[in-house]
Swiss-Prot record:
Modified residues (N6-(pyridoxal phosphate)lysine): K109
NCBIfam families reported in the protein's UniProt record: trpB (TIGR00263)
InterPro entries (alphabetical): Trp_synth_b_CS, Trp_synth_beta, Trp_synth_beta/beta-like, TrpB-like_PALP, TrpB-like_PALP_sf
Class in the EC hierarchy, top level: lyase
EC numbers: 4.2.1.20
Record key words, sorted: Amino-acid biosynthesis, Aromatic amino acid biosynthesis, Lyase, Pyridoxal phosphate, Tryptophan biosynthesis
Encoding gene (name): trpB
Catalytic activity: (1S,2R)-1-C-(indol-3-yl)glycerol 3-phosphate + L-serine = D-glyceraldehyde 3-phosphate + L-tryptophan + H2O
Protein name, entry field: Tryptophan synthase beta chain
This protein's pathway: Amino-acid biosynthesis; L-tryptophan biosynthesis; L-tryptophan from chorismate: step 5/5
Quaternary context: Tetramer of two alpha and two beta chains.
Amino acid sequence: MDQPATPNSFRTGPDEQGMFGIFGGRFVAETLMPLILDLERHWNEVKNDPDFRAELTDLSTHYAGRPSKLYFAEGLTKHLREVSSAKGLGGGAKVYFKREDLNHTGSHKINNCLGQILLAKRMGKKRIIAETGAGQHGVASATVAARFGYPCVVYMGATDVARQSPNVFRMKLLGAEVRPVTAGHGTLKDAMNEALRDWVTNVEDTYYLIGTAAGPHPYPELVRDFQSVIGTEARAQILEQEGRLPDTIIAAVGGGSNAIGLFHPFLDDKDVRIIGIEAGGRGLDGIEHCASMNAGSPGVLHGNRTYLLQNADGQIMDGHSISAGLDYPGVGPEHSWLRDSGRVEYVPILDDEALEAFKLTTRVEGIIPALESAHAIAHAVKIVPAMDKDQIVIVNLSGRGDKDVHTVASMLGMEI
């Protein structure tokens, strides 16, 4: 739901079959196909419906608190210029944060949830299910379900339930039923598997509110369109504040919804460098990471073809990240296409690097970022000192870090 694409654009996908080049599609059980086609029909009806867009805009403004601020990170910029000077480089770009952490519920997830709950209402559904990793999508789903009077079930890996207890409590307060998933490693992939099983069983009355830009078509498209408000706002805001577009934009990539939301409105701005940050975990030499585009290969998972972490037999591998929201062995199909097209660079950041960026941002900005966002900030910390002072970098601060304080305390050997 941003500006129209142009000829020879990077923004024209997906095609009618839901494909971005060789990625995407809808690989689902026969039981689900009629529901997927019905969802696509309703999505095609509402995506250009002015009444639907007006209702979504009203909710986004008065309920979620949009537009989110584009904030000049003066403290971080000053720190990185000092680093640049100490290295004899004499540079250091200006760093801006797109403050999705200031939204209602504390992250970008509310953008998508508001859009999808309105779609569920149009479709006449009576029950909402969702999957969650870090818990932010679960909280946002429970929030919109409460706002519109829907019962809500959230599937969450048992590992994530343990490391994201504040968000589990928030979901329950909002009236959602949280179902821990013990299969596999008990993380986001396993939660999504269980949500899909629920959906197959309850196809008539249930709406599956997917939280990321993955899954079968039309989910990658509709999630992207609901999240593209991030980039649409950021593009207008930087033009107003600096009089020009940024040189570089950076966002963390798990499934990839916050990233594609920032990236999509900038894809045809050829002078804007776009960088997606994957979870490098404990390093790409082993298997303890979630860098599917740096260390994976194409395959099918959760209804779409995309880059995955898989073994030689095509079995999906369980990755690792300090960040529950990046702990997913795949990525949205549009990201896979953007990787192969060369338009977007995808770079891994290690757990330790993200943790250092988390601490640095807290100290120099007075902002506690989500560990997902800290991955993106960590890459900015690497590249900004070597850039010129008149250059501009936008980092998507996708969520706040309240949910991560227990994880960080444990990593730092502190007791809360």
